Amino acid sequence: MKIMIVGASRGLGRALVEGVCRAGDTVIGVSRRRPDAVMLPPGVELQWIEADMASPAEAATRIAQAAPSAFDVLICNVGIWEATAFTDGYAFLDEPDDAIVDLVTVNITATLLLLKRLVPRLLESCKPQVILTGSTSALRQSGRPEVAFGASKFALNGVADALREGFRGSRLAVTCLQLGNLNTDDALSVPIEEAAARGDGGLVPVHDVVAVVRTLLRLSDAAFVRELVMPAIADERF
């Protein structure tokens, strides 16, 4: 299996690079800069493409030039948020215009251009699959006030629905992962029990997201998961 992961240098993206593959697979990481000392299971081949999603047209072209002519899975782990998001200091009316434009550019425009260039290569696979990293902020009545971030993640739901319809005949599986607050401080090398203890139930370990994605990748071509909602156990919004 050949898997491309966009937004792969740190946090969840890096955990996916290090955790979803098994012997014989190829993982292609994409980020602005290639990280050091990526730890992979034995028998997994690593490739890397350096591209800055803040310049979406240039990034999409660069990725398309370097990507394989065919691969099986595209995981779009693309997303930035407001500087004061998820803090008491957030105020939509105080957000700089250019910051909102930059957020939309990375979270929506870059994702669309990337999909436009890479979906044809996915369709060469006998089991093509797209996984979009969304957020519980994209759910109705999520209880979050971050307007631009929430709107950008809500847009991914529309992208996923439209992709499914447009390529239903090609059996393209498209999944949105609606993730709650993540513990991205503890890498996969940290025992999951220790990672789960951080935040006292308020943070989802990346280990759990990796476990779910592994399951998605191992489904037969007769089924797919349309949407998966994964909040932290102590999240009072759910």
Where is each model-derived feature located?
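Substrate-binding pocket helix/loop in short-chain dehydrogenase/reductase
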Residues: 85-101
